[in-house]
Amino acid sequence: MYRSSISIQVFICVLFLPLDSGRPLIYMIDLSYICSDATVFSGKSRVIFFSNPICEHTRGNFYLFYLNYIINTFAPKNRGTRRCKPFGLHINCRKKIDCLHVQLSYILCKNKSRKRHMDAHAITLAWLAHALT
């Protein structure tokens, strides 16, 4: 498998409107840590991050892999919680995007110790979801 030696650094500026009607926040996110060639193992699923998600031919796959990785890693483990089906090819479906937002709001509410970490993921996902619709 070919691995590029080029280091890619991507910054996006996102306006985040909290679900609880709190004060809007502006984040500058460094996406370079997920833009390099890497293989991440989450449970039994193998997730590959492409080196250049900006390229048209890999962009869609990059988004799908990243969304699936976040859901697999941080989704509630409670059996009684309604879970989203794996996104896969259904990522463009508005219903799935809405379900994603519900899951993220649940995670942010239940895991206070992870709140800062999940804030970054939540707004990154919001940006990616917007780019897909």
Swiss-Prot record:
It is found in: Secreted. Glycans are attached at residue 111. The keyword Glycoprotein applies. One of its GO terms (cellular component) is extracellular region. The keyword Signal applies. Residues 1-22 form the signal peptide. Keywords: Glycoprotein, Secreted, Signal. Its main location: secreted. This is Uncharacterized protein YHL037C. It comes from Saccharomyces cerevisiae (strain ATCC 204508 / S288c). The lineage of its organism: Eukaryota, Fungi, Dikarya, Ascomycota, Saccharomycotina.
